[in-house]
Every structure is written in C-alpha cells, then in structure tokens.
Amino acid sequence: MNVLTFLIAAAVSLAVVQADVISHDAVVPFAQPTATTTEQKAGVKFKPQIHISNGCHPYPAVDANGNTSGGLKPTGSSSAGCKGSGYGSQVYGRVATYNGVYAIMYSWYFPKDSPVTGLGHRHDWEHVVVWVDDIKLDSPSIIAVSPSAHSGYNIYYPPESNTIDGYSAKVDYSSSWVVINHALDSTTDAGETQDLIMWDQLTDAARTALENTDFGDANVPMKDGNFLTKVGNAYYA
C-alpha cells in the first residue's frame, strides 16, 4: 500500500468512526444541488408534493458526514416531536430504467410511525415511484404513479389528472384504524416539496450510512439491496 492509498483509507476510516446516530432534529439536510446529468434533471422536474394528513412530517435521515437520525419512540400524539425540522426536510431520489421506461423513486424519512399513542415503531420510510416514458424527451409524460403502502403499492395507471400538478405527483401520508401504520396514496390535495438529493449526489459517508444503518422496522427503499426489487414490485403492468 503506497502512502497516498494509506492516507485515503485512513481518512475514510476516520469518517466512518466519526459518523454517529444523533437526535432526529439535529440532522442537517443536503441543500438541493444543481442538476447536471439527465437523471438529476429529471429528478428535479418530476419532484413530487407530499401532503401530511396525520403523523410526522418528513425529516432528513442522514447528514453529509454520515450521521443518521435516531428517530423517536412511538409516544405522545402521532405528530408529537416531529412537526418539522428547523433545518428543513429532504426527499431522496434515484432513477432506473425498467422494461423500456423510466422509474424515478422519491423517498421520505419520518422519525416515527405512530398512528396512536403507544402503537407503531421508531423510524418510517415511505416512497413513490413515478413512471415516465422517456426522461430525454423535451415533453416527457407520466405513465403511472406507485405510492408505497404497507410493503406494497397503490398503483395508478394512468394516474388521475387531478393528482398531478404539472410534472409533480401529489401524494398523501396518513394512517387509519383499519390498517394502523402510515402509508402513502395519491391525493388531490396540494402538498409541500423538499430539497431533493439524488443517490449519486450524496457524499460517500451519507450513502454508506444509508446502506448500513439499521432503521428497525423501516427499510431504506433506495439502497442497493432494495432499490431494483422495489422498482419491480411497483411496476404498473
């Protein structure tokens, strides 16, 4: 091992050692960077809106140094302690081609999934897959929208026109007594957007943290071990 290789390895090891689990409201999100690739530009173009009917608002899950959110215990009201981060929120994106079309996955992290006091679990990840005919076109079209719901998907092919605002799909985060835990679904209600960070725009430390951190009952949908499987499950045909 030469000196340069040793120094790089040492720096990476130090970054991993320094990364920690921190308070959910201490995680600083990534500012949305300038999109430079076709995939990144598509991510920005089709960035969805999320409406919160009940429960936590989305929070950043990881910071640039690889520190991850410790989440919240499922105590208090469904939104207790998680009505929004003072640092701002985050949506995570990743793109794949699948059966000749494009799948853009947008993922949100929530500190807890607690429909009522004492029920639920620490951490929640939800996502929506927006299906686009060809992101290289000047005027691409949304073919389908697949919001995540209880380890599966609500698939809309084609989506109702009033659930799309321009190029932005509108999704709702809510729970009910019937299914207990929170999920996403399409909605006609306008929502909020967050700064987008694409998978390839994350720092190495942040990406490694999302790959390796144990979020308990919640799974990071866009990490390598989950991404393509979930895209396949979200397919509309």
UniProtKB/Swiss-Prot annotation:
Entry-listed glycosylation sites: N67
Pfam families listed in its UniProt record: NPP1
Signal sequence, renumbered to the chain: 1-19
Keywords carried by this UniProt record: Glycoprotein, Secreted, Signal, Virulence
Domain note: The structure of NLP effectors is remarkably conserved with a high level of conservation of a central region containing the conserved undecapeptide motif AIMYAWYFPKD and heptapeptide motif GHRHDWE.
Places the protein is found: Secreted
BP GO terms, sorted: effector-mediated activation of plant hypersensitive response by symbiont
Organism: Phytophthora nicotianae (Potato buckeye rot agent)
Keyword Glycoprotein among UniProt keywords: yes
Motif (Conserved heptapetpide motif): 120-126
Name of the molecule in the record: Necrosis-inducing protein NPP1
GO cellular component, one term: extracellular region
Role noted for this protein: Secreted effector that acts as a pathogen-associated molecular pattern (PAMP) recognized by the plant immune system. Induces necrotic cell death and ethylene biosynthesis in parsley. Stimulates early induced host cellular responses implicated in elicitor signal transmission such as increased levels of cytoplasmic calcium, production of reactive oxygen species (ROS), and MAP kinase activation.
Family note: Belongs to the Necrosis inducing protein (NPP1) family.
Renumbered ranges of motif Conserved undecapeptide motif: 103-113
